[in-house]
Amino acid sequence: MLHIKSLDDGLELFKALGSEIRIEIIKILLENNGMNMNELAGKLKITNGALTNHIRKLEDCGIISISNEAASHGNQKKCFVHPDKILIDIESQEKYKNIYKTNLKIGHFTDFKVYPTCGIASSNALIGEVDDIRYFTHPDRYNADILWFAKGYVEYIIPNFIPFGHKIDQITISLELCSEAPGINDVWPSDISFKINDHKIAVWTSPGDFGNVRGIFTPDWWYPNWNQYGLLKVLVINEKGTFIDGLQVSDVSINEFSLDYHSTIKLKLEVEEDAKHVGGLTIFGKGFGNYNQDIDIHINYSPIISSGDKETEENSAIS
């Protein structure tokens, strides 16, 4: 998913999509699961030079990714559509003026219960051996940039350093996820639960464990028949409810947690044993997948208003 956080940020994207031929390029690439430049130029009946200009515009705004693949006559450039969807924040976020930004490295979980197939790795090497849950306690796991398991959970503590005397109004969590199948399987659904302080706020069904092409940032040493990339998901919980990629998925609101400057905030990602689709979970961090990021978190906060302050504000409004 491509997340555009303001209309100004999306200007180059809007320009790139404001062309019939570039829309046609995207449609052809989706229909053919990617295509090399020569084939694409032939399909469109345009020169390679003209195509290169269009591809560059789509690549610059994150719509298309290009990989070099071996062919009978040397390497060739193959184009793929990068995001599965585009999320654009149109509504002004001015009411959330105070934002605390942080991130969680994939290996910084504080609790876990996982089952094989499973494993953990940094961007440089595997940590221990696959399918051995003991390595989820190895000291090197703090350096992990990817982890996967068939069912169970990992739990993180979100750093909470908002100023004294403030409450939390909204939490936004952005991370790259997919299922965990034996090998790879694009059709391997998995129901992934998101929990805050052990309270389920949302469930997202991952469609599969993706490996049809190498992840943009996945290291060269990574086995080609292992999961290569995931889907970027943006989870938001505020006073209106819980949202994934801009769509409301539950009525659970931030108000139910009464979170403030001294609250402990636990984030659990779980594939429950009794879920409809028990298809595992893979979490991608920096150095893996299609999005070079760890678990990114934004916390919006505002001053705690006492009952006396509220009464004063209401009286002022009346007068």
What spans do the regions from the language model cover?
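Short beta-strands within extracellular/lumenal beta-sheet-rich domains
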Residues: D145-H166, V249-S253
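Amphipathic alpha-helical dimerization/coiled-coil segments
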Residues: D84-W148, G152
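Extended, solvent-exposed segments with strong compositional bias
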Residues: Y135-L147, T205-D260, H277
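Short, cationic-aromatic polyanion-contact patches
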Residues: K15-I21, N36, E69-S92
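Short coil-to-beta strand junction motifs in C2/discoidin
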Residues: N185-I196
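Alpha-helical residues within the helix-turn-helix
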Residues: G42, E59-D60
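Key DNA-contact positions within bacterial/archaeal DNA-binding proteins
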Residues: G49
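A short beta-strand element within beta-rich, extracytoplasmic domains
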Residues: K167-D186
